[in-house]
Amino acid sequence: MRIEEDLKLGFKEVLIRPKRSTLKSRSDVELERQFTFKHSGQSWSGVPIIAANMDTVGTFSMASALASFDILTAVHKHYSVEEWQAFINNSSADVLKHVMVSTGTSDADFEKTKQILDLNPALNFVCIDVANGYSEHFVQFVAKAREAWPTKTICAGNVVTGEMCEELILSGADIVKVGIGPGSVCTTRVKTGVGYPQLSAVIECADAAHGLGGMIVSDGGCTTPGDVAKAFGGGADFVMLGGMLAGHEESGGRIVEENGEKFMLFYGMSSESAMKRHVGGVAEYRAAEGKTVKLPLRGPVENTARDILGGLRSACTYVGASRLKELTKRTTFIRVQEQENRIFNNL
């Protein structure tokens, strides 16, 4: 046993210090990034935000809607091959280039992902997702996927420390997914005591990944557009959003009605709700590590997407970054004990 004395920070414990700017308008900010990935050699350009691979967020409808904003969607792994075929048949190449195919690490997952990728060469992203990316089996699966799909861009996670980022990149991952426990419907930190404050995880993992020519995606912990800006400021190449995109028409959650008002269910993928839906229930040897919440219906996701992108542009203008790429170089974090004036929050 040992204790690390270094202070670790989350998004709510910092603000970004404003700096002199020559920008005249938020419209002057370029949010599009251009990437060439380490292992796949593929090039991609777009806004580096990803809708999370949750079945109440990462749906085909969400992918179609967010593609118009140049935003990626990690489509959840529970669609059948036949459903994928129908989606591909009805989608343009522009939509497909904004889609990630999500998978677990079982042999059945591998075979299903292979069938999906074979449906259309425009599917260039694979998202290998497990709750605990520290297992040897997971690393071996990433290496197996890289060997099987040498030209596909592989995103793999989740981890929160630099040495594991390095191992995954060396095993074939182009992008490492960073975050354990920060999600709005994740209870891993409560059930297990395991986790890492998200901003510090992003800063440390970005440093490790960039040293090897890899990239990271900050996954979880964002509740406002300002948090998205902080993640990019901390060095994230991509930011994945779940709760901020939940509850919309495209989100796919079940709608329930209480006292004449309609709500949409949103739950973590390790929650009892998710396990009952997809594997018949919670196995006797494990605990659920997610919760289910009821969200008021939020309408089309396009309004939320515009709000997020608008906040991100505004953050860039406050620090003088004319491009999103420059934001991390222009970011100085200050530690704070309050974020906002909350006097009217309950009204």
Curated annotation (Swiss-Prot):
Cite the EC number. Answer: 1.7.1.7
Task: Tell me which Gene Ontology terms the entry assigns under biological process.
Answer: purine nucleotide metabolic process
Gene Ontology cellular-component terms listed: cytosol; GMP reductase complex
Task: Give the matching SMART domains.
Answer: IMPDH
What catalytic activity does the UniProt entry give for this protein? IMP + NH4(+) + NADP(+) = GMP + NADPH + 2 H(+)
Give the molecular function GO annotations: GMP reductase activity; metal ion binding
Positions annotated as active site in the UniProt record: 186 (thioimidate intermediate)
- Annotated Gene3D superfamilies: Aldolase class I
Return the broad EC class. oxidoreductase
Residues annotated as binding NADP(+) are 108-131, 216-239
Q: Keywords on this record?
A: Metal-binding, NADP, Oxidoreductase, Potassium
Q: Where does K(+) bind?
A: 181, 183
**Family named by the database record:** Belongs to the IMPDH/GMPR family. GuaC type 1 subfamily.
Task: Output the PANTHER family linked to this UniProt entry.
Answer: GMP REDUCTASE (PTHR43170:SF5)
Please describe the quaternary structure of this protein: Homotetramer.
Q: Which NCBIfam families match?
A: GMP_reduct_1, PRK05096.1
Q: What does this protein do?
A: Catalyzes the irreversible NADPH-dependent deamination of GMP to IMP. It functions in the conversion of nucleobase, nucleoside and nucleotide derivatives of G to A nucleotides, and in maintaining the intracellular balance of A and G nucleotides.
Could you tell me what this protein is called?
Answer: GMP reductase
Protein's organism: Shigella dysenteriae serotype 1 (strain Sd197)
Q: What is the lineage of its organism?
A: Bacteria, Pseudomonadati, Pseudomonadota, Gammaproteobacteria, Enterobacterales
